[in-house]
């Protein structure tokens, strides 16, 4: 900020501002001035652009006009929410001195820093989504350490990733609101599209310092008990993250009590492409509609909703834990209708407790906590009906907190105001001294009514009335027409258009007494409110345990309701390799369709591990494949599944190579994206992986594409032996079952009726007889003359190739076109390697070809 030059030439107020701004150079500074938060210089210009607020000037300082923008203090949360959504951080600077006693500028201090990853105010958060702060570290060998913290719950997780591909998947899974990275970070391409990037000095990632910080936070001598002692890369990231939180929160963090190491071998691994293609919590357009979560998540608490989404993104491999969840869902099926109304009243206890820990809880947070405690007895009574060990385990974690409930019932009014400074938070009868001061203040209304009647009758002024405002205090108001009747001892305080306002010694004396009593009452309220924190915080650990158990109860009750309402069945998790599904349905598509969904079977086993899927476009191949993956994933979060019966063996990873588009930002063509995803599968799949391969090789020439598809299928069947669904339009691949053990053909059925086609969406054994491409083109609205011409060419090609239905290679096409002299454009096209072109080169070439064709 160039305006900080010639510091002494600035006004005292601007000098104070510049000192505070120098301490927070990279973030916006909201500087409190009266009823506004003001921004100056570059901050003002940036805020004006981002918030669409007026940019003005505040006189001059150091000979230059000062750019200025401001927001009203009562609306600041709305503006903070917008800035946080845009990935910005803000330092909040408040007046802490008394203007009446200050010489020079009122003393000010930055009291909190709001960043996208550390917000706790409910107005700034999406209530049904986790809001994570993350830190990333990379060593010289290319391995990564990664840490995440949800400050609204205290959930602190670390992991280590061997390469960029797995790190990319983890970034997509966690989707952090803010990401800290070292200034020397080399893999910027991995994170450059992340919002809320914060570059940090290299020394903040020092491992030994991290261990000291973490031991200090947890009150431990070492980290062995957390299982992270030797995870050096993860600790580097965790240390930076914890230091950042301490710097921004400027208070204790008692709700961050432990750190957990997440190991890839404990969960089913889903790479970034799979998470995207399966549309788990976000659809391909970036929204939330028509996703698995949109169907599965009817949780009645926000904390339950967030937990369910974590389950969806982290399917477990521990069969025992999954069976516990299944048992709990079965036990809750007859009880969820009775249980959910009580759970709904618990609300977002998890985030309320985080604000309590950070001492930022507002009166309504304590009211919500009280209301949650009042539901506990009813929740326990319902759960008592479920005679099932895992439910009993959850009940034990949900302590009743009767003493805390009684404390809050006695201390907090039924409907408290938003802020403590508004007064009226502490209930009457809780503190005798507070009641006395309130009685004095509240007696004002009776006194004022009597004064008004007395003065009106005494002086014969029927328009006389007594009032109060925040600027002038108490006053006696008389209409302009009767102002000549007021006695001499009335002192004029304010003149209005149609009235005069006066003060008398008696009223002034009473005003001082009332304002003193109100001030005393408010001071006592604030003290009592702080004392409530001291009484609640010793129970924080038990409260957090209880909130987590309630969230899990909500998730399980929700899954019980979904199973009942959507006709899901309990899957059998077996130790034998394979997937056997009878009457399987796509959980999302069946909810979108207006007509009944056609259910289909799936059999995968060691002796039937690769299925070649053929059939028409729009026949349902992609839906069938995704359906298999989603049913498997649901089984491995412990949910019931959309099927008549499902028996599912061990799964270590789910891969999808389904659909593709150009990645222009990275300079990758559709075919390059397709091959990159295919390479990832061939390198990392195992015999326990579920692999979905859709239309491999379609982005290149027929020979190249067919060869690649054939080789990939062989590799998956012979070397990897993964459970694979392989959809293709290359009919040559339907001969693979004759050559490869463990391979079979299935197809999606369709029936032609004259010029039209009916898609049966039914899976049948064997290969499809035709691709029905022209019928689909006609349905899509391709002009009839084009369809007629296409049919003619199809007959010619089929005559030359000697068969119909199979894909036709370039030789037959060249035979048809051999008598045609190639044009300049064709000659130029033959020299082009499309996969080596950048988007810019392709555009330039297009203009060149257009010129040749003139």
Curated annotation (Swiss-Prot):
SUPFAM superfamilies the UniProt entry points to: DNA repair protein MutS, domain I, DNA repair protein MutS, domain II, DNA repair protein MutS, domain III, P-loop containing nucleoside triphosphate hydrolases
Q: Matching NCBIfam families, A to Z? A: mutS1, PRK05399.1
CDD domains assigned to the protein according to its UniProt record, in alphabetical order: ABC_MutS1
Name this protein carries in UniProt: DNA mismatch repair protein MutS
Question: What is the documented function of this protein?
Answer: This protein is involved in the repair of mismatches in DNA. It is possible that it carries out the mismatch recognition step. This protein has a weak ATPase activity.
* Organism (species): Proteus mirabilis (strain HI4320)
Which keywords accompany this UniProt record?
A: ATP-binding, DNA damage, DNA repair, DNA-binding, Nucleotide-binding
Q: Which family does it belong to?
A: Belongs to the DNA mismatch repair MutS family.
**GO-annotated cellular components:** cytosol
Q: Which GO terms describe its molecular function?
A: ATP binding; ATP-dependent DNA damage sensor activity; damaged DNA binding; mismatched DNA binding
Binding site residues for ATP: 615-622
**GO BP, one example?**
mismatch repair
Top-rank lineage group of the source organism: Bacteria
* A family per Pfam: MutS_III
